[in-house]
């Protein structure tokens, strides 16, 4: 996930910040407890496509580009 894209994407429901879960290929909104899927490298930012996220799940940070 491109960090520049992640900086401008927000949750479509609450407009809150999203966190990238590389392992699950999802964008997580902690405020709404929703996980938006990333399919073929494209974030699907539709509320109908989101699933309930797992509370307390630890998300490993994405490695910086070039590492």
Curated annotation (Swiss-Prot):
Transmembrane segments: none annotated. Coiled coil: none annotated. GO terms for cellular component: cytosol. Gene3D superfamilies: 2.20.25.10. InterPro entries: Trm112-like (IPR005651). Belongs to the UPF0434 family. This is UPF0434 protein RALTA_A0561. It comes from Cupriavidus taiwanensis (strain DSM 17343 / BCRC 17206 / CCUG 44338 / CIP 107171 / LMG 19424 / R1) (Ralstonia taiwanensis (strain LMG 19424)).
